[in-house]
């Protein structure tokens, strides 16, 4: 008979940003153990609060099913000697299985007859298995840094206080992480019963809500926070900024969510909203509220972990906490504006970018020069791009950014606007960091794009130039920087070549770089990011590899090739031509002679080779302007016309003829054929 199963681990406060991943991994690991043990069930559901991780398995089988295990022995031909007596090999196998040779069964196959032992294995009761399963599941959690507590050597992400393991109403005895299983559950720290007993797994999680004032269902808590926050924001005429990462963190901080609305003085709205939002979201875990025009309102929403009889006191307490932080932001904003941003430029000499690469002032000088170079290439205003590059890092020296680090860039924009800088220059100070993450917006102007690319390329070339390419960790966010440059170039269709960009960036470091292969290393690294990007976009690895094999260093051109090859692959001729290209590549690789520059028409003998040569020559001439214009999809569609003449050639022509001149001419034809495709990609790498 199947029963519901429960395991709850009571702990001290778990890290909120890791709570969901811990709970999901616990469930996944435990379910994998059940599957490996052939234990039937109707699903595993995880629960998680700041002070507990729990799993409930619906209708878990009470024991493993009995099964018959077949153990094959030696072949009958090797199991008996000429007189029919068991050989030592047969006797040893039988002894190892606790039987005699005579007791063995026979297994007949089309390859012969074998000795066989069928052993009936009784399934173990689930009570004997689940404690070990849970221990293994917990040991496999993604814990970045474990801790010890008390005098024990036991390690876990946080000290463990209670353990409850129930199968139906049966308490399963056992110990995990130094704590023995018991029926005791802990309630909310400030509400409900602090401790109480649970009689059956069926009571979970309802008993926690009823007696402990704890909502163990993580997703249910999150749903309440979202719904109540939306209602609360609407009540003050706005819409809450319910960023998922913050909602997840808040959900992980409370066991009994109570959504409340508070306010702050309107005078603080004179401060750039980004600084206020940084304080509310980053420091206090509050949800800002915006009006229909996306203008910040003097209200915020917060989630309390307690149901107070006097919610006004809770609201006033939170208002009292946030007020000094907003006042700090106001003070920093007013103080910083007393000095023009450009006056802070010399102070960048005091800030180190990287020991071997110099100060942030050095980096600023390089960004300024590189931004001007890029601006010229893409038709942006060079002078404004250089001005933006010069001011790009000056806000790092302001009090606001020093205190609220995530406001860098956006505060530079506000201060530059206050100083009377050009609007696009000011905007570039904010947009220089875009895209900041996968799927983020790109810089909106060419000037911003020039500065953003200059900043990222300077970091890439500099760090690679001193031999610190990312391996496991990526402290300088080089992967993000590389993808950012690629996205800007591709999505804005800039005709830029990584070779030129990297060479220019490298030249600005003077003799600071020690890696002689820095240019190749950076370009290869950036092209490697294409693989991850296009895989995320749904392109298969072989399509990406086919283009990478040609190492095109213009990102916008790379993009055209990938899309063209993807389109080509859907054509009827694709599989045949990919196989033919692979065959041609193999043939040419084995030839160590010298090929001619052109096909000698006089040496063509077979009708099939004449037809192919004619088609290749026609396409080579016709596709020259198509290749030059980068119309790769059109080019591959035309090259698909080669399918029939190529198939006919291989069916009717002996490539490796005895006559050397004839052989060389045929190889020259195949080489010219292959080069037509290689002008786009190596389609021989396409898989079926």
Curated annotation (Swiss-Prot):
One of its GO terms (cellular component) is cytosol. InterPro entries: DALR_anticod-bd (IPR008909), Gly-tRNA-synth_bsu (IPR015944), Gly-tRNA-synth_heterodimer (IPR006194). It comes from the Bacteria. One of its GO terms (molecular function) is arginine-tRNA ligase activity. This is Glycine--tRNA ligase beta subunit. PANTHER family: GLYCINE--TRNA LIGASE, CHLOROPLASTIC_MITOCHONDRIAL 2, GLYCYL-TRNA SYNTHETASE. Keywords: Aminoacyl-tRNA synthetase, ATP-binding, Cytoplasm, Ligase, Nucleotide-binding, Protein biosynthesis. Its main location: cytoplasm. Its EC number is 6.1.1.14. The keyword Acyltransferase does not apply. It holds the Pfam family DALR_1. It catalyses: tRNA(Gly) + glycine + ATP = glycyl-tRNA(Gly) + AMP + diphosphate. It comes from Aliivibrio fischeri (strain ATCC 700601 / ES114) (Vibrio fischeri). The keyword Cytoplasm applies. Coiled coil: none annotated. Belongs to the class-II aminoacyl-tRNA synthetase family. It is found in: Cytoplasm. NCBIfam families: glyS. Tetramer of two alpha and two beta subunits.
